[in-house]
Amino acid sequence: MDRAQVQIPAEQLARQRDFETKIRDMHAQRPLRAMVDTFGCQQNVADSQHIMGMLEAMGCTFTDDPAQADVVVLNTCAIRDHAEKRVYGNLGALTHTKKANPQQVICLCGCMAQRPEVAEKVRQSYRHVDLVFGPQALWKFPELLYQVYTQRRRVFSVADEHGSIAEGMPVVREGRTRAWVSIMYGCNNFCSYCIVHYVRGRERSRDPERIIDEVRGLVAEGFKEITLLGQNVNSYGKDLGIGYDFADLLAALDQIEGDSLIRFMSSQPKDASHKLFDVMAASRHVARQLHLPVQSGCDRVLRAMNRPYDVEKYLELIAYARRVMPELVLTSDVIIGFPGETEAEAMETVALVEKVRFDALFTFIFSPRPGTPAARLPDPVPREEKQKWFDRLCAVQNGISEELHRQYVGQTLRCLVDGVSDDARWQLTARTAGGRLVHCTGDKNAVGEYRNVKITDSNTWALFGEVE
């Protein structure tokens, strides 16, 4: 893809800043209040932070109450049917706030909004929604919102575009603990069950200098953890044409002085390499944490999923990563019940989980996405049967996670204290360098700081301890 076509010109981005000023001036007598509700992955979280940055530049303050908001933004996820149903439920509930405040502007954006059938459904059945735009139009949100205000009409911007890169968009990040940094956008993998490449476009890598400058700035601001984001970070740089890959980027970021930890997600096994693992092992600031989705432990199912690796390749990668990083925390994704999968094939996945012994596993029953090849495959196995396979898989993984967590009891771990615990028995939540959740007692002044935590107990999902 031509880089000149991918990069949004500076003058077009400056034009968006002008629209932000115009909207702020339009509402100077009573500044707008906005609510941004985010569904889905960390990339959506990062996108929402840019949306909030643009809204803040428009003079907005923020609220969590849609009834108090002049602008409501739902940033949506299309990865599973359940996520879409939640969004439609929320859209339905907003009819009441719109009725109470007819001037309220309701915006639908994100991956779900990029799907033409969704945009048409919203156009016909959710007439209180004023603005619909996909991920490719995120950078021109101020212009689209300005059109809603000045032209008094509904605006839809879901054109079928390859995607772009917009640098320098405003951003609002909460606190100084964690920051998300997108290093690339889109996906070229075309897994047969996945809709991401249809709604996020083809792969586009940001220039490494831009990423390095952004991370250096975040470290200087005091952020303790920085997570690099992409649909497949391991393919970073392929489109740049300069012989620069993700391992090179990690090595460069590791040279930034400071007390910050670098994480990354998500990864594709086909692009993972020994070079990447060697860079991680030699680094000072890169977490010994790897999320490497395997999706299935059956080679036939992997081929049907259009995942271009086999179980042997996956196991070789894991063996090498663990050899150079014995302390590695390994997590993965698994889909159970892919169309045509048999019980014996599902049990191959269970066997792989038993062999690899992941620290944690994100497990899902297959959810057909309209427009994907997998959605057209015959799927004769009843949901109830798939649920049994799923429960078996979860039982195995839960036992492994509980056992692995138990080995930390009695140890003292350096953790980043990141907030107040939802569990009434504990004051704080923290994360180990490997990303393990820790509920702990301690002074709330520790939030945002690295502290040593003495681990006193554990269960399947978390560690428990005391801040020293």
Whereabouts are the PLM-identified features?
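Proteins enriched for Cys/Gly/acidic motifs involved in redox and nucleic-acid/cofactor modification
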Residues: 1-236, 275, 290, 312-323, ...
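Short glycine-enriched, charge-decorated loop/helix-capping segments at active-site entrances
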Residues: 78-79, 200-201, 240-243, 303-309, ...
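Short flexible coil/turn linkers enriched for glycine and charged/polar residues
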Residues: 174-177, 187-189, 286, 296, ...
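Conserved, mostly hydrophobic/aromatic
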Residues: 191, 211, 228, 264, ...
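Generic beta-strand/beta-sheet core signal
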Residues: 37, 196, 229-231, 265-267, ...
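Terminal RNA-binding accessory module
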Residues: 1-3, 19, 376-468
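Conserved SAM/AdoMet-binding glycine-rich loop
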Residues: 106-108, 115-117, 220-348, 354
